[in-house]
């Protein structure tokens, strides 16, 4: 059966979301049609607002609606430690843990030559520039996911930082191979940070 064009377009739009297949997209489209008009308007406004008002912090790459994110602008954070993560959602996981009070640097991806993602496509250059300009940093924690891409990215960054004589550490074993940091519980993350090892 062919759906009317507006419904087909909405189904197609939902299918662009990760993990959403045609059946789920169709259910969401019909659910959206049954929503009160005000809820649909609020939903569409929220989508537009996120695209218009959220940007990357120019210092660390975290997402923010301010000029500089709350973490970078907080003088009470430990200025001597920077934790490098893949995505803002990983940063949020460590913040929810509540044990780490240093700074962050968000790469927005990992090296993946097969996908055409090299050092220029993620925030590696800005990390090195940041370290060169900041003498306060004594340790960089590489908190990347335990995937082949995450491992190779960690080794690449480690080699770039070593000449600066800054301590480079990585999370302790405890996160299962291939698992995402965002799904790890707070206790696992806390142990991984506390037991971090030098590279």
Curated annotation (Swiss-Prot):
Q: What family is reported?
A: Belongs to the RecR family.
Instruction: Report the Pfam families cross-referenced here.
Output: RecR_C, RecR_HhH, RecR_ZnF, Toprim_4
Any one Gene Ontology molecular-function term assigned to this protein's record: zinc ion binding
Report the protein name in the record: Recombination protein RecR
- What range(s) does the Toprim domain occupy? 80-176
UniProt function note:
May play a role in DNA repair. It seems to be involved in an RecBC-independent recombinational process of DNA repair. It may act with RecF and RecO.
GTP-binding recorded as keyword: no
Q: Which Gene3D superfamilies match?
A: 3.30.60.80, 3.40.1360.10, 6.10.250.240, RecR Domain 1
């Amino acid at each position: 059966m062919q759906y009317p064009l507006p419904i087909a377009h909405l189904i197609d739009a939902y299918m662009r979301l990760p993990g959403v297949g045609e059946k789920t997209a169709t259910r969401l489209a019909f659910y959206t049609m049954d929503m009160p008009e005000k809820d649909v308007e609020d939903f569409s406004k929220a989508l537009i607002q996120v695209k218009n008002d959220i940007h990357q912090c120019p210092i660390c790459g975290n997402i923010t609606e301010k000029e500089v994110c709350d973490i970078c602008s907080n003088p009470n954070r430990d200025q001597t430690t920077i934790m490098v993560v893949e995505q803002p959602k990983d940063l949020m996981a460590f913040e929810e843990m509540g044990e780490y009070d240093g700074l962050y640097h968000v790469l927005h991806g990992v090296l993946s030559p097969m996908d055409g993602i090299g050092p220029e496509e993620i925030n590696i250059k800005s990390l090195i520039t940041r370290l060169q300009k900041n003498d306060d940093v004594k340790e960089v924690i590489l908190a990347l996911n335990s995937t082949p891409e995450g491992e190779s990215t960690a080794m690449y960054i480690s080699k770039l930082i070593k000449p600066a004589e800054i301590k480079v550490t990585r999370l302790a074993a405890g996160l299962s191979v291939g698992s995402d940091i965002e799904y790890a519980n707070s206790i696992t993350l806390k142990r991984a940070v506390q037991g971090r090892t030098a590279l």
